[in-house]
Amino acid sequence: MDKKTAVSLLVAASLLAGCAAKPDQAQASSAVDSQINDPFEGFNRTMWKFNYDVLDPYILRPLAVGWSNTPKPITSGIRNVLSNLDEPASAVNYLLQGQPKEAIVHFNRFWINSTFGLLGLVDVAGAAGMQKENQREFGHVLGHYGVGFGPYVMVPGYGSFTPRQDIGGLVDSTYVPLALITPWGSVAKWALEGIDSRADALDKDALLRNSPDSYILFRDAYFQNQNFIVSGGRAPTTENPNAKELNDVIDEID
């Protein structure tokens, strides 16, 4: 389960909580439903069942529990290093969206933390008041310019993805310093980010388990989350009635 999938688990739980308080949720989410392209739903449900019923409880969740019990200075330091590696890609992607202010923040955070923060281990820039902007992936840039998701796919271990977001991820991997990381280093980064995000979702497990259709909830949360990010957190409430909940969840990850 990758970071995006773990984040979607958090968002799904948030949406489930919102649904309990909003009987008209189905009508309010129609705009998101119209964007969902799930031609492989039968296959995806099988993969979801394997990921959720086998890989998560026997592999990912135990790792996440261990991670959550690791001393905070260690997990925070690792999280800072991994996040620092993504700063240049976010800077470029914000520039591509015509948002130079956010791009400059990401660029400055990268060189300051890389130089004075032990290659990002310590968030010196954040301590100086330069708070991190939301990460921007090239897939989000494509969404910003109206490119559709493409078909939704769920695979064992890797989790959920769409062509737009994964093609965007390939583009992001060409930016320095991500382009300098070895294949095994990239796998380690991906795994650590997934475990870290899964640890953040541990207290949401019961909500997802209690859903009448966890696959649909999780899938819809994926699209809600991506749309919320692309909109810069400014999605109209008619399209995203859980905007505050989503923002709170995303803030947990950031």
What residue spans do the PLM features occupy?
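A structured, mid-to-C-terminal "fold-capping" secondary-structure block
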Residues: 27-34, 140, 144-254
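Post-signal peptide N-terminal segment of mature Sec-exported envelope proteins
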Residues: 27-54
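Mid-length scaffold segments of soluble, non-membrane domains
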Residues: 84-163
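Bacterial N-terminal signal peptides that target proteins for export
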Residues: 1-7
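Beta-rich strand-turn-strand
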Residues: 78-79
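C-terminal motif of bacterial Sec signal peptides marking the signal peptidase cleavage site
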Residues: 16-18
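Bacterial signal peptide processing site
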Residues: 20-23
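Membrane interface segments of multi-pass transport proteins and intramembrane proteases
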Residues: 61-74
